[in-house]
Structure formats: C-alpha cells, structure tokens
C-alpha cells in the first residue's frame, strides 16, 4: 500500500498526518520527510498516525530516529494514535515511556 502524508503548521508545531502502511517499503520515505522538516528548522513535530492501517518494526525504528533527531535539535516529537493495535505496539516495546502519545492532534499540540 502506498503511503501518503499531509503537513500543516498549528500553534508552532508541524503536524504530519500519515495515511496507509508504515513498513519496510514506506518507512524510508517517511523518515526522509521528517528529516527534511527538522533540517528546515521545524523541530516541534506531531506525527498523526490516525490514518495508519499498519506499523511494523521498521516504522517503529523510524519513529525513534525521528524523535532523536528532533530532540537533538532542541525540539520534540509527539504521536497521535487511537488505533489500539498500534498503541499496543508502543506499550509492548516500551516506547510509550519515551514517546508522548496523545489521542488527538489538539491534545498533542497543547501538550496535555
């Protein structure tokens, strides 16, 4: 399945909404997109996974990489996810401790 993204700026945060599957075939494209944003100085990122059908270990690795890159440049990466299967992946891997996972974009931007 093809991956599609939409990007919008809200209250100082760059929100990247992702649609499709984030896997070994598509994660490199998403990583390139997020890296480009950080290189542009857009280091406060919200990754909205509400439209993601599937996320594999390659996708998880890409998210960790993006988080590190954003924080290295003085920013942060927050995740929006309500899909139980994907949220469970964050819990099983312990990434829920390193990542801020929120139920909505508004909550992620507000930080609560």
How should these model regions be labeled?
Residues 1-3, 112:
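Absolute protein N-terminus
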Residues 3-32, 51:
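STAS-typified acidic loop motif
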Residues 106-112:
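A charged, well-structured terminal subsegment
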Residues 100-104:
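Short acidic-hydrophobic, aromatic-tinged amphipathic segments that line or gate anion-handling sites
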Residues 27, 105-106:
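Residues at or immediately preceding the N-termini of alpha-helices
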Residues 24-98:
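Amphipathic alpha-helical interaction surfaces in cytosolic regulatory modules
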Residues 10, 84, 106:
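Residues that form or immediately flank small-molecule/cofactor binding pockets and catalytic motifs
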